[in-house]
């Protein structure tokens, strides 16, 4: 996985198919599941653990994000659980989709720190709105 710069000056990890296969599908300890939507145009990778459904990755076009989220919630049916996901408040469309679907801002809260080794990177590091992250970017989930 490598850093990827997006057109709107945000940064994320380039998560290729082989990266996702190694990270989730072939994981030696944890079981992860994939929920696809619209002929695999949108997919959610999640883990079920202790009554929590943790959305570790959510890849979707902006027009499919809300309907896919609703479809995912409906697919859980009668399963009694708490669904957790990380979403930056700076990702306004995704954040509002989560809120409209009944998600409430709560824990776990993503926190990180940085030490700038190269002054050329200080603008990037000091701007949290330039980062795209998911629960899968942490070793916790």
Residue ranges of each PLM-predicted region?
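Amide-forming acyltransferase catalytic core, primarily the GNAT-like/NAT-type
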Residues: 1-58
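Active-site/acyl-donor-binding loops of N-acyltransferases
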Residues: 43, 47-66, 70-141
């Amino acid at each position: 996985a490598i850093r990827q710069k997006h057109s709107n000056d945000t940064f994320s990890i380039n998560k290729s198919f082989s990266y996702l296969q190694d990270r989730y599908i072939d994981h030696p300890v944890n079981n992860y599941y994939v929920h696809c939507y619209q002929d695999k145009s949108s997919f959610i990778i999640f883990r079920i653990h202790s009554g929590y459904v943790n959305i570790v990755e959510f890849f979707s076009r902006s027009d499919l994000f809300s309907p896919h989220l609703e479809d995912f919630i409906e697919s859980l049916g009668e399963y009694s659980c708490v669904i957790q996901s990380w979403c930056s408040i700076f990702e306004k469309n995704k954040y509002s989709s989560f809120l409209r679907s009944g998600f409430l801002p709560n824990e776990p809260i993503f926190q990180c720190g940085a030490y700038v080794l190269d002054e050329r990177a200080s603008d990037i590091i000091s701007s949290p709105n330039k980062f795209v992250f998911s629960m899968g970017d942490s070793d916790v989930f």
